[in-house]
């Protein structure tokens, strides 16, 4: 039995254990039927030809978790933002962990999605926002919609600015083999509201602290979908940290719908994973909208990360800014495919798109394709990409100043990515990412971390 057939046959059993919301049930049923028609993508699909997704679609993968694994705080504390208070939604192997989470319904709803789907109180919100902006022809989005249950639900009311950031933390315990996880996040910011969200992926095994290890273990495939709705004048800073085990894979689909005068920024930091695919989609539906996408990718060994971005300008007087940096060592590979669409009605658009890549390894490679589709005539749009290596003259200069070659390469590599990092508004998060970068580069950068 193929993985596709196995998942389709698992759907009825999943629904028996799911919530009773009729709208969500209809969405799941339609999604699994559409997934059954189109199946998984392969290299014949234009948007997947550089990403070998087939190699992680193991037939042994299952959506059913056998048991809940309890993890000691000492083993996961470094995964949290340190030094500040935060709301937390912690998922261990795709299951909500109330012990390490910190949720609230005071002033805002920050809780687990399954509790909302099961509660009639939220039926109007679910009917209005859930599954409204996803691509219904994208295989992994359909699969997530078929099995969506656990994840984060965040609803910030009108004119509320959250007093502390929100963390969504996915932890792979290593306690079960062959899991295919389907976390689903629904984020709603009402008119004039403001929030900061940090979503991260980690593995206990990769940090040598998993209490579970056994022969024949198959790493999980995490298929995440996030829907974000920003009403007028809302403001969101959204950060993604993907620092998982080198053999663990992540498919991340994020859809952001913005109303007039709203601002959304999304920073993606891809540091770990076997196959990582990020589909980031912004839909601008109103005037004076600002959309910001920035990312840093640092890979080694045989890792592969694929960034696909879309900004759809459907209204005039809006801006979008994309800047992605990639650093590839050993035999790692990367993809950047960025697309900006400007409708005919969307005059006075200012759109910028840039992808710069540094090949540190002799056998590393990257495929990059920035695109513009412009149907309006009064716009200011630009795009570009570069692929290169470390500047030999700069490296020589640092060595003449008594800096060892390894440290000199580390300093130049850090400087290459630094301007993206400097746009992180949360100091504690910026420090955390600096530490990860220093570890990935493998040198002491001399910063006070």
Where are each of the predicted segments found?
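Conserved beta-strand/loop scaffold segments within soluble protein domains that form the structured core
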Residues: 99, 103, 109, 113-403, ...
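Residue-level "edge-of-site" marker
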Residues: 48, 411-412
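Short, surface-exposed loop/turn segments at secondary-structure boundaries that line and modulate
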Residues: 40-42, 413-423
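Short amphipathic alpha-helical interaction patches enriched in hydrophobic/aromatic residues
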Residues: 15-18, 420, 424
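N-terminal amphipathic, basic helical "cap/leader" segment at the start of enzyme domains
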Residues: 1-142, 326-329
């Amino acid at each position: 039995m193929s993985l596709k057939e196995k998942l389709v046959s698992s759907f009825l059993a999943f629904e028996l254990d799911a919530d009773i919301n009729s709208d969500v049930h209809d969405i799941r049923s339609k999604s699994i039927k559409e997934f059954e028609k189109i199946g998984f993508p392969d290299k014949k699909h234009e948007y997947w030809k550089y990403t070998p997704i087939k190699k992680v679609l193991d037939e042994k993968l299952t959506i059913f978790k056998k048991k809940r694994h309890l993890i000691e705080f000492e083993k996961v504390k470094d995964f949290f933002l340190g030094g500040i208070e935060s709301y937390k939604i912690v998922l261990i192997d795709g299951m909500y962990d109330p012990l390490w989470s910190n949720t609230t319904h005071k002033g805002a709803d920050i809780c687990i999605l399954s509790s909302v789907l099961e509660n009639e109180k939220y039926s109007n919100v679910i009917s209005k926002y859930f599954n409204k902006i996803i691509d219904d022809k994208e295989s992994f989005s359909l699969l997530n919609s078929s099995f969506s249950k656990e994840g984060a639900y965040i609803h910030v009311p009108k004119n509320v600015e959250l007093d502390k950031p929100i963390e969504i933390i996915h932890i792979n315990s290593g306690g079960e083999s062959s899991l295919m996880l389907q976390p689903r996040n629904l984020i709603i910011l009402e008119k004039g509201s403001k929030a900061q969200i940090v979503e991260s992926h980690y593995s206990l095994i990769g940090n040598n602290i998993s209490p579970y290890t056994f022969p024949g273990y198959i790493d999980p495939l995490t298929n995440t979908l996030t829907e974000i709705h920003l009403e007028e004048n809302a403001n969101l800073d959204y950060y993604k940290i993907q620092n998982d085990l080198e053999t663990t894979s992540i498919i991340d689909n994020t859809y952001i719908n913005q109303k007039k005068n709203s601002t959304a920024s999304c920073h993606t930091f891809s540091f770990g994973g076997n196959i990582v695919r990020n589909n980031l989609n912004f839909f601008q539906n109103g005037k004076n909208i600002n959309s910001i996408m920035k990312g840093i990718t640092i890979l080694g060994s045989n890792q592969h990360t694929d960034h696909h971005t879309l900004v759809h300008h459907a209204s005039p007087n809006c801006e979008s800014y994309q800047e992605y940096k990639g650093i590839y060592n050993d035999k790692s590979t990367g993809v950047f495919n960025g697309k900006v669409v400007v409708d005919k009605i969307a005059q006075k658009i200012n759109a910028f798109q840039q992808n710069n890549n540094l090949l540190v390894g002799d056998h590393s490679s990257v495929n990059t394709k920035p695109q513009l589709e412009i149907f309006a005539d009064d716009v200011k749009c630009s795009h570009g990409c570069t692929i290169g290596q470390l500047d030999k003259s700069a490296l020589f200069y640092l060595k003449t100043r008594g800096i060892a070659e390894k440290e000199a390469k580390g300093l130049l590599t850090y400087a290459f990515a630094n301007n993206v990092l400097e746009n992180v508004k949360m100091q504690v998060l910026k420090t955390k990412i600096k530490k990860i970068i220093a570890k990935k580069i493998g040198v002491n950068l001399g910063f006070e971390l």
